[in-house]
């Protein structure tokens, strides 16, 4: 972890490089998708092929289309049910991807959380992803949606996410600035990094 934090500065890319499983959670519009797209672009040019799974929308294709050569080693797809996401992840275990990106990993669980089998399916999904990371060396990057309370912001299914992900970042707003804060592993002084978003993705400040 030391190479990812120097003089109190949070070095996102270095932390992601050395961590098998990374999660970015935050409120809608905070910049989670842009962070994942930027990391995917930079990682997969060197360590492809990669699979990027969207469970919400396809607006990111416009940004990808403007940098199509930078995403030459990334396959994009969409799924819109928890069952289909599980099926896709199982099939991925037979493929040769180096990195799997899921944006977002808990949105489909949130949609069916009232169903009796949803927690079991979500737990199975998380366990299988962890297993692929440990046995096959597959890097897992994901975002998570949150529910906003009066005093705090917490991702749906956070207890499971915290258990299965090695490195967790909170993405949010501080006054007029966007930030990424390291939540796990925990530190006495919480490292934080500010960023902006332009037409190509995230620019770290």
Language-model regions: role of each:
Residues 138-205:
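Phosphate-binding/switch region of NTP-binding enzymes
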Residues 3-17:
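Pre-Walker A adenine-sensing motif
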Residues 17, 28, 44, 90, ...:
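Signal for well-folded cores of large energy- and translation-related assemblies
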Residues 18-92:
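Conserved P-loop
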Residues 38, 65-69, 114-117, 155-158, ...:
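Short, glycine/charged-enriched secondary-structure capping and boundary segments
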Residues 79, 90-163:
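P-loop NTPase motor core
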Residues 11, 84-88, 157:
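Short acidic active-site motifs
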């Amino acid at each position: 972890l030391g190479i990812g934090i120097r003089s109190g500065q949070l070095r996102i890319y270095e932390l992601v490089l050395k961590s098998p499983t990374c999660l970015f959670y935050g409120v809608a519009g905070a910049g989670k998708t842009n962070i994942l797209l930027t990391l995917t672009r930079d990682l997969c040019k060197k360590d492809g092929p990669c699979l990027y799974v969207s469970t919400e929308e396809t607006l990111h294709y416009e940004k990808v289309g403007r940098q199509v050569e930078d995403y030459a080693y990334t396959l994009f797809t969409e799924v819109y049910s928890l069952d289909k996401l599980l099926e896709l992840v199982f099939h991925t275990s037979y493929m040769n991807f180096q990195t799997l990106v899921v944006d977002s990993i808990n949105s489909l669980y949130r949609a069916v959380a009232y169903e009796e089998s949803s927690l079991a399916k979500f737990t199975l999904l998380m366990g299988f992803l962890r297993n692929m990371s440990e046995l096959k060396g597959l890097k897992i990057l994901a975002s998570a949606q949150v529910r906003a309370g009066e005093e705090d912001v917490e991702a749906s299914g956070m207890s499971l996410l915290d258990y299965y992900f090695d490195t967790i970042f909170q993405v949010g707003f501080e006054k007029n600035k966007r930030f990424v804060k390291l939540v796990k592993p925990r530190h006495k002084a919480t490292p934080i990094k500010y960023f902006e978003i332009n037409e190509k993705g995230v620019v770290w400040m």
